[in-house]
Amino acid sequence: MSFRSIVRDFRDSFGTLSKRSFEVKISGFSGRHRGKSIGPSSELDDTPVVAQQSKWAGLPPELLRDVMKRLEEDDSNWPSRKDVVACASVCTTWRDMCKDIVRNPEFCGKLTFPVSLKQPGPRDGVIQCFIKRDKSKLTYHLYLCLSSAVLDETGKFLLSAKRSRRTTHTDYIISMDSKNISRSSSGYIGKLRSNFLGTKFIIYDTQPPYNARTLCSQERTSRRFSSRKVSPKVPTGCYPIVQVNYELNVLGTRGPRRMQCAMHSIPASAVEPGGIVPGQPKELLPRLFEESFRSMATSFSKYSITDHSTDFSSSRFSEFGGGALQGQEQEQDGDDVNKERPLVLRNKAPRWHEQLQCWCLNFRGRVTVASVKNFQLIAAAPQPSSGAASEPSQAGQAAQQQTQPSQPSSSSSSSSSNHDTVILQFGKVAKDMFTMDYRYPLSAFQAFAICLTSFDTKLACE
């Protein structure tokens, strides 16, 4: 019996798990108030019942491990990789075995489960994606490339975002649901918010980073000067993990945009040899209604992490841009934590193309249309030289005309070579279609949110 027939067999035995309904119990309500039946956002309380009904749940661990390993190796790409996800949906035993067999994208370079969207990309390669823009609906959809052709629109849906213009800022709601893109949906995983000029952005994540305590303390400090009230909506965890700054073009000179990203959830040591990204999520668990109502009741009496993004004053941005690790951690014993700085990404230095008479970047065939939105980000050096800011390389941007990559201007060590590696590149290939390639230490969610900043209107950067 082939492994594919085994997968089909246990699928027929179980049926579709999504058709089951589960009841949500909300504490603090009387018996006449019953929770509504919801799908994937509820807890699977009847997992033992499913396991008893399955004839595959009692497989010996050695046999189950062999089946999972062979299936994971055979179905390495989408759409056939959905069989691996189906195996993880069988029961707790199969789910735990899949988690043990399927490695993170950092080591296998594959996106398998939804949590992979918030885990770092591969160290030894890139994950190629593309973004489709719908101007009429103000939506953006991220897909995983299933082909090497840049104009091939066949892809695996990953994330979606919807733009909402406010009086003083712009919001981009990011969701795993392609249709219901809102903060109330079960697929909501974060958002992007810009200031009025479109020069400063903050990326918010629903998953707490490793330094969530420090980020929350900074948010509470900045909110003391804000008089705006808490929105009476069901709150959702919101942690400011990234700040993106675009340099103002006061003189109005023609050229590409200059940007800098402060990754507050990623330490600068992550790109060094042997470095890691701490606090990687192992699963995406939606918040229960019980927790939401409890935190909504307490948010009116004290500052909460669920309402960070009401103030967009300059002092607030300076707090995030200056010190990412200040505050309560200074009271702790570990001095190493205080010395850890956030990873900073900047534009890669381009080279001058004599024939085109412009500054160019080598996108290796992944970008074909010249656009001010195109960019490549690399890790900023710990101690940048004084002349680096004066180079036109900070404004690096161009089409894909050249064939040779730019060479380093001076001899570099292994550490400097790590800082020359392109971590994220984004560029235009057709009307309303853009490519996005990312790698370690960024996740798909972080890379997508950074690319969304390039779509926003910038009144003082062009």
Swiss-Prot record:
Tissue localization of expression: Ubiquitous.
Domain F-box: 54-109
Region (Disordered): 317-338, 383-418
Pfam family, one: Tub
Compositional bias of kind Low complexity: 383-417
Similarity remark: Belongs to the TUB family.
Name this protein carries in UniProt: Tubby-like F-box protein 7
UniProt organism field: Oryza sativa subsp. japonica (Rice)
